Design a protein with these regions (language model features):
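Enzyme catalytic cores with a strong preference for nitrogen-chemistry domains
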Residues: 1-353, 369-378, 410
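ATP/NTP-dependent adenylation/nucleotidyl-transfer catalytic domains that generate, transfer
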Residues: 7, 23, 165, 223-224, ...
């Protein structure tokens, strides 16, 4: 439960149709197994106490009384279970029979939630036996541990846990999810951020993918966690087969699902803090004034082992096909944004400072696409290489060859003489390789680019990426400044994949070779003299690994995670790559630079948002 994580379980027990005593034993057994795994919310299928396929046996008083006795047995067995448990059973109330979900915690029955939408089509005929839930909240008398208790009966119920801020749970049953307006919509806008669904969804060909999309889509639409527990093999197979397709989703992502046709326990770690952060960001997320019964349940405050995985590169899709689609999409967004600016300002040229590094390479590739979109010749791109004290032959040659292969206009301006003269003017010792020595070169390059843009009636295209801007790894009014920054919302780890995608898909073999060599070149501003002709100044040795900084950046910006939580999940994600001490070192560096360098981000040029 630390850091907003809570382990939940969707469970399919072995059952026998209409054998409530046996089913209660199996439910208790699975309940204890799920609790032993650390699960704090445990969800069983629809009508699991009796079995969903009892048909006209639901009219038998023996079955209904047996179901109540079984519920009481499960309730008592839950006394030592530190979890909120949901089980399904038929319940007679005011002369009508309802299909309900019973919420139990620490030996207490907290509430009964009836099913609203009863399917009576195709293979279903639930309206033969059950009454749909009405909108009215009622109370039933129930024998508690010490005295009679009044238990809420109705759909409008939310169960909340004071030991875990923000943990609010509501229930719906099977078909409730499949209708145009599920009860979970009202539950969510009333404040529930975890929805449980007790289901008995039969298996027919192709239904599993639809079900998976339905659960994932509902969790995305409602910005919630969704736990879906499905009936399994023990149900009658007279007409139907049930595959125990259990699913756990969070905000559009399927975190876990069972192997179909096997009754099993599926667990996952929901991130309640993440759900709440997403809802805070969504200022259009509505709230309801409807009356809801809020029932408290208690859980022990303890840390469970975190099983959830986190991608080392959260900005980059792990699947190759998804990654390629994402790269094409991002390049199109960048190029279209630049094309609009190019046409709107009636620019005659695009001026790009090309260094032979990743960022300027991506900017040049985007500029070429923008010209193609606008129907303008690529010779209108002025690709400027500006060798100085730190330039190596490798980056220089790559910059020149890249420009030629893309069909841009190459211009070389050697700035060594002008920088040396400038150092003499301000009294800077050329042998003192301090911040003035480095930034003087960066600002001279920007001045050259700005003047060339004026001279050619063009605009300077910024090359700096989001990771550099987050860390302030840019010279103020040097490479920090341009007239349109195409890479401003692209993190460094993604820049690398965008360039790689261009290399993989380009038809020009020589262009691909140049791009691969650029990818193989260490990241460097090349502001210090090389050693033996090779790059001596490596950015990641100075500010830290970009894969770590992009990981930190993602969870700071996207979900507002606290430093301790980021440190914890980074340790899990990069186990075996970086030790805890190294991660902490660069996390501290990240936060220091992120806040200290805000002044640079306060005056950035425009640039397209890509994600």
């Amino acid at each position: 439960m630390r850091d907003g994580f809570i382990k939940v379980a969707a469970v399919t027990p072995d059952i026998r149709v209409a054998d409530c005593e046996y089913n209660a034993e199996q439910i208790c057994k699975k309940m204890k197994e799920a609790a032993a795994l650390g699960s704090k919310i445990i969800v069983f299928p629809e009508l699991c106490i009796t079995g969903y396929t009892c048909e006209d046996l639901f009219w038998q008083e023996v079955l209904l009384n047996g179901a109540k006795d079984a519920l009481d047995q499960i309730r008592k067995e839950s006394r030592e279970i530190d979890a909120l448990v949901f089980v399904g059973l038929p319940w007679e109330w005011k002369g009508k029979l309802y299909n309900v979900a019973a919420a139990i915690c620490h030996g207490r029955l907290l509430g009964l939630v009836p099913k609203k939408n009863l399917p009576n089509y195709s293979e279903f005929y639930e309206m033969r036996h059950f009454e749909p839930a009405n909108e009215e909240l009622d109370y039933i008398e129930y024998p508690g541990e010490e005295e009679q208790e009044w238990i809420p009966f109705g759909m409008q119920q939310i169960f909340y846990c004071p030991q875990m801020e923000g943990l609010t749970v509501a229930a719906e049953i099977c078909e409730d999810l499949w209708v145009p307006q599920p009860p979970s919509i009202t539950h969510a806008i009333a404040g529930a951020n975890v929805i449980v669904n007790l289901s008995a969804s039969d298996e027919i060909t192709g239904k599993d993918s639809y079900r998976r999309n339905l659960v994932g889509g509902q969790s995305a639409r409602l910005v919630c966690g969704y736990i879906y527990a499905d009936a399994g093999e023990g149900e009658s197979s007279t007409d139907l087969v049930f595959a125990a397709h259990n699913l756990i989703a969070e905000n559009g992502t399927i975190l876990a699902q069972s192997k179909r046709f096997e009754n099993e326990i599926v667990t996952a770690d929901l991130d309640i803090h993440r759900i709440r952060a997403e809802r805070r960001r969504m200022t259009t997320y509505p709230t309801t004034q409807e009356e809801y019964e809020w029932t408290e349940f208690e859980l022990k405050t303890e840390e469970t082992k975190l099983e959830r995985t986190f991608a080392q590169m959260p900005f980059v899709p792990q699947n190759k096909n998804d990654r390629e689609r994402r790269c094409e999409e991002i390049l199109s967004i960048q190029a279209l944004g630049l094309k609009k600016r190019l046409v709107h300002t009636n620019c005659k040229s695009l001026v790009v400072g090309i260094s032979g590094g990743l960022d300027s390479t991506l900017a040049l590739l985007v500029a070429a696409r923008a010209c193609d979109m606008a129907g303008i010749g690529r010779d209108h791109i002025l690709s400027v290489t500006m060798p100085c004290f730190g330039t190596t032959d490798r980056t220089y040659q790559n910059a020149c060859e890249l420009t030629r292969r893309l069909g841009a206009t190459l211009k070389e301006v050697d700035i060594r003489k002008s920088v040396t003269c400038h150092f003499e003017d301000i009294g800077q010792d050329i042998n003192c390789h301090d911040v003035t020595y480095e930034n003087g070169q960066a600002r001279e390059r920007t001045q050259v680019l700005m003047d060339l843009a004026n001279k050619s009636g063009g605009m300077v295209i910024g090359t700096g990426d989001m990771s550099e801007l987050a860390l302030g790894w840019a010279t103020y009014n040097g490479d920090h400044m341009s007239m349109y920054g195409v890479n401003a919302s692209v993190p460094k780890t993604l820049v690398r994949h965008l360039v790689c995608y261009c290399a993989d898909t380009c038809e020009d073999r020589r262009l691909g070779e140049v791009l691969y060599d650029i990818l193989d070149t260490p990241v460097s501003p090349e502001l210090l003299p090389p050693e033996d002709g090779k790059i001596s100044q490596k950015t990641e040795d100075l500010v830290g690994p970009y894969e770590l900084h992009d990981f930190f950046l993602y969870y700071v910006l996207r979900f507002g995670y606290a430093p301790g939580k980021i440190y914890r999940i980074a340790g899990k994600s990069f186990a075996g790559v970086y030790d805890d001490e190294t991660i902490l070192k660069w996390l501290k560096k990240f936060y220091w630079r992120f806040f200290a360098q805000q002044f640079k981000r306060s005056c950035l040029p425009d640039g397209p948002k890509v994600g």
